[in-house]
From Swiss-Prot:
The protein, known as: Transmembrane protein 132D
Extracellular compartment spans: 31-913
Biased composition (Basic and acidic residues): 233-245
Region (Disordered): 233-263, 1021-1042
Reported tissue expression: Expressed in mature oligodendrocytes in the white and gray matter of the brain.
Signal sequence coordinates: 1-30
InterPro entries: Ig_TMEM132_2nd, Ig_TMEM132_5th, Ig_TMEM132_6th, TMEM132, TMEM132_3rd, TMEM132_C, TMEM132_M, TMEM132_N
UniProt KW Transmembrane keyword: yes
Transmembrane segments: 914-934
Amino acid sequence: MCPSEMGTLWYLWSPVLISLAALFSKVTEGRGILESIQRFSLLPTYLPVTYHINNADVSFFLKEANQDIMRNSSLQSRVESFLIYKSRRLPVLNASYGPFSLEQVVPQDLMLPSNPFGFTNTFSLNWRLKAYILQEKVYLSHPKVQVLFHIVGRDWDDHRDENLPCLRVFAFRETREVRGSCRLGGALGLCVAQLEMLPGWFSPPSVVSGRRRPTEQPEGNPVELYYAVQPGDERGDCAKEDSRKSGGTPAGHNDVDESSPPLHRIGSVFLRETPSSPPLKELRLDSNVAVHYVPKTVRQGDVLTFPISVSRNCTEDRFTLRAKVKKGVSIVGVRASSSSIWDVRQSTEYTGKYAPAVIVCQKKSAGSEKSVADASYEVMKIDIEVEAPSDPPTTQLVTWQVEYPGEITSDLGVSKIYVSQKDLIEVIPLAMEAEILNTAILTGKTVAVPVKVISVEEDGTVQGLLDSVECRSSDEDVVKVSDRCDYVFVNGKEMKGKVNVVVSFTYQHLSSPLEMTVWVPRLPLQIEVSDMELNQIKGWRVPIVSNKRPARDSEEEDDDEKKGRGCTLQYQHAMVRVLTQFVAEAPDPGGHLAYLLGSDWQVDITELITDFMQVEEPRIAKLQGGQILTGQELGMTTIQILSPLSDAILAEKTITVLDEKVTITDLGVQLVTGLSLSLQLSPGSNRAIFATAMAQELLQRPKQEAAISCWVQFSDGSVTPLDIYDEKDFSLMATSLDEKVVSILQDPKFKWPIIAAENEGQGALVKVEMLISESCQKSKRKSVLAVGTASIKVKFGQNDANPNSSESGHLGAGLHVENINDRRSKKPFQEWGSPEGPFYSSSSMGLMEGWGSTTKRPTFQKKEGQENLLDDIILSQTMATDLTSFPDQMDLPGSNVGTEEHDLDQAAKGLSDLEIGMYALLGVFCLAILVFLINCVTFALKYRHKQVPFEEQEGLSHSHDWVGLSNRTELLGNHMNFASSQEEQITAIDRGLDFEESKLLLSSNSQNSINGQMFRSTGAMLTDDQEQKSEPPTSPTSKRKRVTFSTFSAISSDDGCPSGNTMVLSNEDDIKWVCQGLDPGECTEPHSCMERLHEHV
């Protein structure tokens, strides 16, 4: 590789390296800004609107991961997401700020995107339709299928006349269908639909010629069941349907069309021609004898048969079985089943209708039972008849016991006979809610869900069961059940949650499970503090209250600051909220954890645990209302959340109160003339709802008034709404910069000044000063903590472009604020994204739209050499910002308040870790470039004796014709291109010169030896004329170029040393030369020459 190739590579790669370095430094700088924002403050900037949810039983505000700064980046709006978990009527969202208040009913379609009860007039939040198949096996002798439907989530105590829908049930078998219907009703909101299966469906599947014979299923012929929800007729009855008792209808005909409601699958039933023998329940008396019976409900006059079996391995030759019954049943007969093996005789020792039966069994011959193949065999059958019960219905007991010779007896065995005049086929437990939110862990208050157990008879009659119901929870660490089986509950002592946890309910011989989902808060809870390091605020003195210890005087304070007796420096405030996720374990072991909303969503539970929050050391910090943290004294402490039921700590967060003082660097001011509120469904969850409150700035009529919203930024980077500070600790003084446009009202009835419109105009017309409290003011001068300006627009009669959505009269009159939805055209939901891409917006105004010329951003003071964090947030997150709303900071009154003092504080802090890293990275890049240049020089010396081709030498023949144009202050700003500045263009004569010549002209820090020769300057450089003609600023020749003529001659250097100096382009007035102190004969060694050259570099 020759030196010319090396120069070409450097020429090509140096812009790439420089660009990469610049790009990397920009990325690092941008990431550093965001990291510093998160380091100092967890709160994004927003309009401090207060939201309240009314008419909801259980609701929560939410936080989505990494979305707060994206959605809340302006003082003009606030976006809050919330969840309506449980409500019996339409909730109402209230947004208020100062004197402005706005309410909006949350539409049902936002809470229920897919509502099967949407056509009803009833609010059906949390309603779910659940179906129970009463018999999964259907026989030809009784070809009926019954399905019970029940509304879960409906309030049983609300007995309003609701127009509940009808349900149509479909049974499909091959290509035919059968239908049935029922209408929901009653306090429990249930009904039973009945379908009669066709006789042909019980036969084995038909064989079609040319096809394989379908395999017979042992369970029977499967039939699929579906249902559809449809409204009733004018009288509330279900629409008349065709009878399907003969032959059915081919599926897809008649009622099944595109306009029909969607079908929902229920399950499958199996059809059999003949019923199989019912399974027997075994009651084992000991290892030898067992009693068997069929668990079922019987009526008066029915006879039950109890088979008695003996184990094949029984070694006893004789035993006596005693059966004792009470009034209502009697033993009517004993029959021997294995007369060849056992001799069975009933004793006549006891007589009477209800006398116990004594049956003596004697084995005839030893070893005769060996012919039995099974493990046990039947010895006899005992028939028991059911008589008229005394108190119908009742349960009769039969007591069994076995005696052996030698007075050896077994334990007593009891079998139950359930006597009833009704033919019960199923019992079903119904819960009013499908899930339980276990907030008892947080509050200590029991959360219970009512349960009712109903029975269903063969004819479809439903009746509630009050007594004789038994229940048991499968896991009491998840959910518990009451002794009377009338509700399931959680009391805060549970350890976990679970999906579909089972609670079993039993009535007589019938048993049915109740499945529920229990959500528990994930521990430990997360305490979110907007600023975990609280400092004293320099210059902000507040009165000392009785329970507040005065801060010790600082050595930096002057005598004037110590004069204010009874006052101390204010500490920073921080906002506190507690977040958690409600989770539940999967029903199967090893399954994934289930979340109430999703893994990216957290629930704000601050209001639930406010009474159990405390600061471990109250002398260091104080927690006001569980939401505002105030520093008290230097030290470190923790915020703790205690369990209401034990001594456990559910969460804790360390906070520090520092001795270092901070100053207020910026005061952001937003004028509010009204509020608008819009709602939209969250794109991240179908249950979360976004509420966007916007501040209106336009004043539309004379004397219309506006309120003030303020945020403060401190020198440590934290930002905080001014509303969280006590209004007694400071005061705001507003000044109109144009009395003709707006005026200021200092009404003592309101804590902050009021701005009133006078005439049309716009701009930064209001200056707001933040002062310390009157009792802590100095004797002669007002102590101004911060100054901010507010932009405002007054346009009378403007109702079309961007009107306020609220009519504002006097602020104390109780204003009615309309929703901006009424005046804006609705736009379709779009996807969140960049300004170029789609984004979700509400029906009125989204987060990134609607900010035209009438919407001004808050203006902050910028200190010299300091970036404003609030501006960084706004500019980086909202691309549609109107830049004209930022007035020049140099023109703002009071913009230099505390500048010098703040600069000293910033200088004392030194470099941050990010800055150190950036400088280290820059040093590495510079070192890499320096090594690259040294390698280039070494490469040039190594190949200095090589010759260039003849064609290349021809390109050097006109080196004396070079002419360079330069500026008076800068010859060439970029040594890679002649024209590098947008404002000034430096022209090069003869652009078509050979590239090797141009390369030699622009080489800055290296010498290129070609053919053993160096270029030497033989002419003097000419400068500009000292006097230039004055020209107007707009003249294209107002900036003259300096013409420099340089003549080069190729002088051979036999000793290898450069005989001339290579021209180096710089920003000096004259062109400098490398090794200008060296004469051609001074250097005899190339290495020493290169060392001298390296020193210059």
